[in-house]
A protein has these predicted regions:
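Active-site lining segments that contact anionic ligands and/or coordinate catalytic metals
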Residues: 31, 272, 319-320, 335-341, ...
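C-terminal, active-site-flanking charged/polar segments
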Residues: 365-366, 376-438
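Feature representing long, continuous alpha-helical segments
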Residues: 213, 240, 277-279, 322-326, ...
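Conserved catalytic motifs of ABC-family nucleotide-binding domains
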Residues: 284, 288, 292-318
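Conserved S-adenosyl-L-methionine
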Residues: 176-277, 281-294, 322, 342-345, ...
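Conserved nucleotide-binding/hydrolysis micro-motifs of P-loop NTPases
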Residues: 41, 236-237, 262, 280-283, ...
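Conserved Class I SAM-dependent methyltransferase catalytic core
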Residues: 31, 35-37, 190, 309-389
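Non-catalytic, mostly N-terminal accessory regions of nucleic-acid modification and defense proteins
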Residues: 1-194, 254-263, 268, 371-374, ...
């Protein structure tokens, strides 16, 4: 399947599932776990079917010999898991709606029994609530919905569908959804900057495991396979989501159910090649005594309250943001790298946090900060900040400097309240880091890829236009032979409209791609890093305009600067613009007077109605309802554009 085909399938599956949810009167929070469980069962059945002939052949070959092994053992070694007959998707689908919840429960229990790695992972106890919804056939319809995933689809498509549903449920759940899901395009940009090549990856607040999945996909695309992941997540239900996510995406690793502030099952200190995370922001109430002697938290200092604690109460850390920052820095091996999401404000926090930040900067391990556009996250409207650490940096000439990137103006609007990075935008932003590192190969590669994509889009447009013109000629010949001028005119109009739509869509795509190409050439014309006002700047720690002089603030806005907009409007253009605005104002004023007149007439009717008889009052009330309604509608329709 092409990426476009996958997107169509994802949207179709989601729309059907969400329509069923709404029809049954269920909340998204009641619906998510059952959905993810069904996606997993469909994936397991699809993957097992591909290995089944090989599994059965080996079982029969060994049967009755000294090397005989249970079918389950052969399946786990060959396919990665064993799938009992009662968990086959077609069997589940064949069962009556009245018993389907129990059938799914038993299927998942059997899968967990056969596969130690999946024990306690599958949401087997949540299907009874679906069975009790307004629509008694809802569960049956859901099982059928995921049967629509083609049997011959590539295995990795299931991981993409799972990820798509995670994102959609995150949107539905609002604030709660942000606790388990980081928008994919943000994670992909983080991975592109981090550029993992193998080793151990830690996420101490892993949510549903999205960081691991994107890192694994990146490494797979680059030919890397040596990847081991370790995640820590305090919410037990989210741990299940993460473990299923890893299974669906063929990622090896361990997810611990623990609170990172008080437990360290990952044995994090100095043990990881990469750390990636989007931890909870601005957590308060962490017990100070529990973290004060932990090297993973205290190596650069622990935030303290300025005021003394009340007697009889335990001291708490005022804000845990810098506990997380400490943890990311101390979890890295000597050449390890980290990428983390922090709220805007953490980079300039004062008091004890400023002192911690100074130590981190002077240690030379902070490599880059990128401020993101607003509305990139489902739960955070304001821009967030990405911090990048590099433990190898202190041994390089770049030790005493930090790269700042302002990405607030680079985004694609998804809807009125959400934004994302396209693949091209991610690569353009990551190119800044590559050029800063002295890697010119990505510059040439990205330019070539954009030029090729633009040429391909143009060729595809020309091919579609040729097909449409051929269809138009065939239709014209048929209708001309029948001497049907009216139908011929309509057919011609329809084809002209289709051709215009094809051109518009293709030209927009070509313009988008060529716009990225122009951006690269304009900002980095020689294929080398340079400071660009409003976009990026390398700031020294010491010296004029340096980080120390700026109070150890790491806010990119202090260093990158702002592009000064030059008004190139001519006097003639200004006069024409003012005349147009005056004409619009005059029109709106006339309409406002008309509305005032109608309001006065309505008030007059009310007054005359009130002085009449009760029966005539009722009559005028009926008339008033119509008139005042019209007046309100008219007034409302005029207010919108005026604002």
């Amino acid at each position: 399947m092409t990426d476009a085909d996958i997107q169509i399938l994802e949207k179709k599956l989601w729309k059907t599932a969400d329509d069923l949810r709404q029809g049954a009167g269920l909340k998204a929070s009641q619906y998510a776990q059952p959905i993810f469980g069904l996606i997993f069962l469909r994936f397991a059945d699809n993957k097992y079917r591909r290995f089944e002939p090989q599994i059965k052949a080996e079982y029969e070959k060994r049967k009755g010999k000294l090397t005989e092994r249970p079918l389950k053992e052969i399946a786990i070694r060959t396919c990665g898991f064993s799938l009992p007959d009662c968990a086959r998707y077609d069997y589940i689908l064949s069962q009556p709606a009245s018993s389907l919840a129990k059938v799914i429960h038993d299927a998942m229990e059997a899968v967990e029994s056969d596969n130690e790695d999946l024990r306690g992972v599958l949401p087997k106890n949540v299907y009874s609530q679906i069975g009790q919804s307004k629509d008694e056939n809802l569960l049956k319809k859901l099982v059928q919905n995921f049967k629509d995933i083609p049997d011959d689809v590539e295995i990795d498509v299931f991981g993409k569908i799972y990820e798509y549903f995670l994102g959609e449920f995150s949107l539905k759940e609002g604030q709660g959804g942000g606790e388990f899901f980081t928008p994919t395009s943000v994670v992909q940009y983080m991975v592109k900057v981090l550029k993992p090549t193998g080793g151990r990856i830690l996420d101490p607040a892993c949510g549903s495991g999205g960081m691991f999945v994107q890192a694994a996909r990146y490494m797979h695309a680059k030919g890397g396979i040596d990847l081991s992941v370790c995640g820590v997540e305090k919410d037990g239900e989210t741990v299940k989501l993460a473990r299923m996510n890893l299974a669906l995406n063929n990622v090896n690793g361990t997810i611990y159910n623990a609170n990172t502030f008080y437990e360290d099952p990952a044995k994090s200190f100095g043990n990881y090649d990469y750390v990636m995370a989007n931890p909870p922001f601005n957590v308060d109430g962490v017990n100070y005594a529990s973290v004060q002697n932990e090297p993973r938290f205290n190596s650069y200092g622990i935030p303290r309250n300025k005021s003394k604690q009340k007697k009889g109460t335990d001291e708490t850390v005022p804000n845990a943001n810098y506990l997380w920052i400490n943890l990311f820095a101390t979890s890295l091996k000597p050449k390890g790298r980290a990428a983390l999401v922090m709220p805007c404000g953490a980079e300039s926090a004062g008091d004890s946090e400023l002192e911690i930040r100074r130590r981190l900067v002077e240690a030379g391990i902070i490599k880059q900060l990128t401020v993101l556009p607003g509305n990139m996250f489902n739960t955070v409207v304001l821009p967030a900040m990405l911090w990048f650490f590099d433990r190898a940096k202190p041994d390089t000439p770049k030790r005493d400097e930090v790269l700042f990137v302002d990405a607030r103006k680079i985004y694609t609007q998804v809807d009125t309240t959400h934004r994302k990075f396209t693949e091209e935008q991610q690569r353009c932003l990551a190119l800044i880091t590559r050029l800063y590192e002295g890697d010119g190969e990505e510059y040439a590669r990205l330019k070539a890829d954009l030029a090729a994509a633009s040429a391909a889009a143009r060729s595809a447009m020309e091919a579609r236009l040729a097909d449409e013109r051929r269809l138009a000629e065939q239709a014209a010949a048929t209708l001309l032979g029948k001497a049907n001028a009216k139908k011929l005119a309509k057919a011609k109009e329809r084809h002209e409209k289709t051709i215009a739509e094809i051109k518009k869509a293709a030209e927009a795509e070509i313009a988008r791609l060529e716009g990225h190409l122009a951006w690269i050439k304009e900002n980095f014309p020689e294929g080398k890093y340079r400071d660009v006002t409003g976009l990026c700047r390398v700031a020294k720690i010491k010296g004029e305009g340096g980080i120390e002089e700026n109070g150890w603030s790491l806010n990119p806005g202090r260093y990158v600067g702002v592009v000064q907009e030059i008004d190139t409007t001519t006097p003639e253009e200004f006069r024409a613009k003012m005349q147009a605005m005056y004409a619009e104002f005059a029109t709106l004023s006339a309409e406002a007077h008309e509305i005032e007149k109608r309001i006065a007439e309505n008030i007059s009717r009310i007054a005359s109605g009130a002085s009449g008889s009760r029966s005539s009052s009722n009559s005028s009330g009926s008339s008033l309802s119509s008139n005042s309604g019209g007046s309100r509608t008219s007034s409302s329709s005029r207010k919108g554009p005026a604002r």
